[in-house]
Design a protein with these regions (language model features):
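Mg2+-dependent endonuclease catalytic cores in nucleic-acid-processing enzymes, primarily RNase H-like
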Residues: 2-124
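Residues within alpha-helical segments
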Residues: 86, 133-137
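Conserved RecA-like P-loop NTPase helicase motor core
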Residues: 129-131
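Acidic two-metal-ion nuclease catalytic site recognized across multiple nuclease folds
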Residues: 137-163
């Protein structure tokens, strides 16, 4: 799920990819998505969930190597899916009595499937798009922003690696 934040403070869901794939195909689609998003949007952070235990650490290391050259984080998930979804859900719904929340969605072929999963959460069997949306939203609001490299040719840790 690709989410951005507009200058006016509203959020935009710009893309959703939801497919059942083999492990190798998942890695390939993640890499291709990183390539496409970087070309189209320039600065995109990719946040991937890290499963607990050694297998999760190994998988995270594998993704970091695969996605060298991209801004990538593998973050261990904590808490249940419902709790993790609450911050994004609050922005989606907005304040009680309001017509809409603070999230816009680009019109695209994936809209119906995306809306159906969000609307049936948490009772639905599939929760991947909700989980991915929550994770993307948390990444935007975590305050972990990265500055662009300076254009004057100077490059130092203070100006480039600021978090």
């Amino acid at each position: 799920v690709l989410i951005g934040k507009r200058k006016n403070g509203r959020y935009i869901v710009a893309d959703v990819i939801n497919k059942r794939l083999s492990s190798a195909d998942v890695r390939e689609i993640i890499k291709q998505t990183c390539i496409t998003d970087k070309a189209k949007y320039k600065r995109v952070a990719t946040r991937l969930p890290q499963d607990p235990g050694q297998a999760g650490k190994d998988q995270a290391q594998s993704f970091l190597k695969l996605l060298a050259g991209f801004t990538v984080k593998c973050i261990p998930e904590s808490g249940d899916k419902v709790t993790r979804a609450e911050p994004f859900s609050a922005q989606w719904l907005g304040l009680e009595g309001m017509d809409k929340g603070n999230v816009d969605v680009l019109i695209a072929p994936w809209n119906e499937m995306y809306f159906n999963q969000l609307e049936s959460f948490p009772e639905s069997k599939f929760k991947d798009m909700v989980d991915a949306s929550s994770s993307a939203f948390i990444e935007i609001e975590s305050g972990n922003t990265y500055s662009a490299p300076p254009t004057d040719g100077g490059l130092n840790k203070e100006s480039y690696w600021r978090k």
